[in-house]
């Protein structure tokens, strides 16, 4: 046998030993029935699920002729897939999908245990306390304070209260003598107004720790969208407000207890848990009870990465110019997980992240597929970093182009609900018409970002703008004889109201419907078509429980290749006419 040259990449080194050897190859097998060379548009509508039609289903209410035509025009080329729970690696069927795990599944073509599940396993087994990350922060327990910063909620999208409770218990049992919690109120992944109950629950837990001799209390707080939890460097002032309260112990609002703080701040007209201003807890002398100082340990306990990265940079980077930190305490900092594998950020973490290798993007680049990916700032990371298995940057800059359109800053998205949908559509259209790319991949964020505001009218406008962007892309595909695949990452805009078990809208004490600002458990559509789609291609009917992870094999087929053997099964079949 001839010995072939070694192929090296960042995951492994493989020696080709000829036929019959069980080595892993990047080379994809040609599909027996589907041609190569067609331009494929992959469109992800963020927060676009399928639900019963009523006035709180903004997708149904909106004028969306393009998406409507995909649903009704070709029944064998439109179906629903699961985008929540175990289908995307989350622990239970009650776990809403989110954009991170959704894009991981779409890009990876396989289901990986995700953040929350990894943390659950580490806490349940106690392995979290044996890991390098915990041992790193544990060295501060004797003389310093352990600070825990994160979202106080049981929403399960960024964090979970029960995980914080277990971490508090475990840390105190492993030597933490002084603990300060810096809480961020939710109102986005859970109902607005629930912050008071979560704070009361936490205060009760901390009181129990104090009875056991641990000096434990809440030190600061604020609403998640106004304090700390910005993402993609959209607005560093959000992080600075958190830094001032958490590290410097400074905020415009000072209270003697967190329950008092949240109750008082919610009395302001139109107050919302998401946007509560920063506050610090002070003692009887007016001194902050828990600023972060030299010798302390800090843990950010969110398991989801995107809204922790900016704070992680502020806590970890010696050279930092995004705002004046005033002082940079010498601390030991660990994330619940590593939030960015490429930046190695943070450098210490309590639970190792899912190792996602051999994503569809990497396979396609190895097979010469020229790729264009685009979204606006708020979802750019999803169509690149998360799609590529939590990996920053291109696999091959010669074959890939990633374009980020700056998102609006300084406003909530219901003020400009069209966002940058048309600009994304234009960029995708131009990329398709240029002939330079084989795959054009976009995320259109409107349904999710505006849906999160709870503004029903604005969300309708958002869905209409998204539909127009899809039309621009599909028109370009028509022009070049290409193929489209349109899907979504999870639900949101299709159900904007909290419901009882029989599906009726829930009312508050004043008789108003309770608006739902979170994601949903609804399935999402997948539609295929275009003049380049080979005759006889249709969705299979033997995969009723198909999920987002099945989509990767599907578009790999549309490029004219068989998917890797370990990928979730393709959604399509080719029937001989």
Tell where the protein language model's regions lie, with residue ranges.
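Feature captures the catalytic ectodomains and active-site-proximal regions of enzymes
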Residues: 10-577
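Basic polycationic patches enriched in arginine
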Residues: 1-4, 10
């Amino acid at each position: 046998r001839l010995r072939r040259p070694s192929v090296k990449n960042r995951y492994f080194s493989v020696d080709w030993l000829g036929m019959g050897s069980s080595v892993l190859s990047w080379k994809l097998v040609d599909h027996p029935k589907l041609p190569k060379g067609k331009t494929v548009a992959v469109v992800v509508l963020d927060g676009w699920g399928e639900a019963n039609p009523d006035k709180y289903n903004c997708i149904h209410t909106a004028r969306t002729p393009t998406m409507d035509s995909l649903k009704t025009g070709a029944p064998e080329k439109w179906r629903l897939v699961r985008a929540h729970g175990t289908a995307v690696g989350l622990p239970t069927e009650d776990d809403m999908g989110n954009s991170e795990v959704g894009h991981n599944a779409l890009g990876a073509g396989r289901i990986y245990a995700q953040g929350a599940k990894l943390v659950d396993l580490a806490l349940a087994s106690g392995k979290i306390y044996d890991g390098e990350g915990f041992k790193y922060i544990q060295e501060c327990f004797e003389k310093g304070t352990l600070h825990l910063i994160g979202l106080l909620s049981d929403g399960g999208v960024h964090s979970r209260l029960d995980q914080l409770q277990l971490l508090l218990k475990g840390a105190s049992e492993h030597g933490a003598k002084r603990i300060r919690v810096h809480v961020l109120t939710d109102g986005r992944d859970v109902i607005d107004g629930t912050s008071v109950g979560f704070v009361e629950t936490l205060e009760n837990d901390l009181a129990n720790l104090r009875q056991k001799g641990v000096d434990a209390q809440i030190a600061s707080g604020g609403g998640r969208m106004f304090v700390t939890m910005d993402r993609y460097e959209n607005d560093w002032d959000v992080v600075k407000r958190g830094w001032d309260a958490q590290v410097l112990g400074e905020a415009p609002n000072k209270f003697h207890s967190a329950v008092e703080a949240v109750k008082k701040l919610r009395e302001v007209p139109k107050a919302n848990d998401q946007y509560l201003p920063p506050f610090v807890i002070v003692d009887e002398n007016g001194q902050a009870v828990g600023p972060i100082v030299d010798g302390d340990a800090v843990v950010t306990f969110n398991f989801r990465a995107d809204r922790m990265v900016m704070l992680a940079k502020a806590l970890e980077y010696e050279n930092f110019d995004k705002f004046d930190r005033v002082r940079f305490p010498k601390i030991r900092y660990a994330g619940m997980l590593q939030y960015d594998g490429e930046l190695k950020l943070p450098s210490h973490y309590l639970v190792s992240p899912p190792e996602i290798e051999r994503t569809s993007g990497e396979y396609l680049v190895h097979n010469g597929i020229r790729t264009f990916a685009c979204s606006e700032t708020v979802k750019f990371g999803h169509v690149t970093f998360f799609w590529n298995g939590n990996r920053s940057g291109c696999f091959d800059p010669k074959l890939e182009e990633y374009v980020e359109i700056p998102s609006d800053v300084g406003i909530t998205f219901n003020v400009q609900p069209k966002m940058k949908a048309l600009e994304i559509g234009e960029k995708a259209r131009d990329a398709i018409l240029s002939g330079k790319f084989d795959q054009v991949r976009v995320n259109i964020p409107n349904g999710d970002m505006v849906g999160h505001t709870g503004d029903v009218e604005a969300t309708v406008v958002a869905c209409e703008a998204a539909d127009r962007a899809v039309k621009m892309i599909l028109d370009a595909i028509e022009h070049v004889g290409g193929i489209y695949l349109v899907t979504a990452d999870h639900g949101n805009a299709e159900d904007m109201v909290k419901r009882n078990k029989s599906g009726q809208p829930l009312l508050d004490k004043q008789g108003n419907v309770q608006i739902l600002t979170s994601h949903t458990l609804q399935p999402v559509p997948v539609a295929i078509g275009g003049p380049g789609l080979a005759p006889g291609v249709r969705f299979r009917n033997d995969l009723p429980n198909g999920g987002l992870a099945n989509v990767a094999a599907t578009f790999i087929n549309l490029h004219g290749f068989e998917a890797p053997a370990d990928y979730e099964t393709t959604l399509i079949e080719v029937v001989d006419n």
